A protein has these predicted regions:
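Short alpha-helical linear motifs
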Residues: 35, 62, 124-130, 179-186
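Juxtamembrane transmembrane-helix termini
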Residues: 23, 57, 93, 142-152, ...
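Structural signal for membrane-spanning alpha-helices in multi-pass inner-membrane proteins
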Residues: 47, 51-55, 115-119, 170-174
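Short, hydrophobic-biased amphipathic alpha-helical segments
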Residues: 7-10, 14, 160, 164, ...
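Selective recognition of hydrophobic, aromatic-rich stretches within alpha-helical transmembrane segments
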Residues: 61-87, 99, 103-166, 173
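Short, intrinsically disordered/low-complexity patches at protein termini
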Residues: 47, 56-60, 122, 136, ...
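Juxtamembrane boundary at the C-terminal end of a transmembrane helix
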Residues: 169-192
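Selected alpha-helical membrane-embedding segments in polytopic membrane proteins
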Residues: 2-96
Length: 192
């Protein structure tokens, strides 16, 4: 899968035929490193790179800090959310397997990470990313029974709890960025 065409095919599969894509993903051998280097580190960079363009008018130094901070936080949140998915799985009839949890988490983020290109639009891009995130949650829901082996009736509550955890992690990540001088007050000062 490490080829560029492999990535494009995988993206198309997750976005257009997620049920089939999850079956293929579940069957593939993978490691934490292979998932990060072959998927997460590539796709998670799209939004931060677009941020450099979309927020450049607020100052290059500020937009670089925001982009780098956002990228690091995306990498960390993906890992932490995968740990949460792994720990929660048995409570919903699933089984523990960190690599499967990371596959589910990382590949579910695909739509949201791709929508990160909308960050070139500045603040408006966030709305597009939000809409793509809703689709990402749906792909997680479809993948949960396949990768976590949870029963279909427990996939909805499992997905809802994971989504809430993901939102909480996103808020914490935003607070970290804000604490690092990249919050709304900094933006307002930069725009004046």
């Amino acid at each position: 899968e490490g080829t560029e065409m492999g990535i494009v095919d995988r993206i198309k599969g997750i976005l257009l035929e997620p049920k089939f894509a999850w079956t293929a993903i579940a069957a593939e051998p993978a490691t934490t490193q292979s998932i990060y280097t072959g998927w997460v580190m590539i796709l998670a960079a799209i939004g931060p790179l677009a941020t450099l363009v979309g927020f450049a008018d607020l100052g290059v130094a500020w937009s670089v800090r925001l982009a780098v901070g956002s990228y690091v936080i995306a990498l960390v949140i993906t890992f932490v959310l995968a740990m949460i998915v792994d720990v929660l799985a048995p409570s919903f009839g699933g089984r523990r397997d960190f690599v499967a949890a990371l596959k589910l988490t990382a590949y579910s983020y695909t739509a949201a990470w791709l929508a990160g290109v909308a960050n070139v639009l500045g603040t408006f891009g966030g709305l597009i990313v939000l809409l793509a995130s809703i689709y990402a949650w749906y792909t997680f829901f479809l993948g949960a029974p396949v990768l976590r082996k949870c029963t279909a009736d427990k996939a909805i509550p499992f997905t809802l709890i994971v989504v809430l955890c993901g939102i909480a992690l996103g808020i914490l990540g935003g607070m970290v960025l804000s604490g690092a001088g990249m919050g709304a007050s900094t933006m307002r000062r930069a725009m004046m």
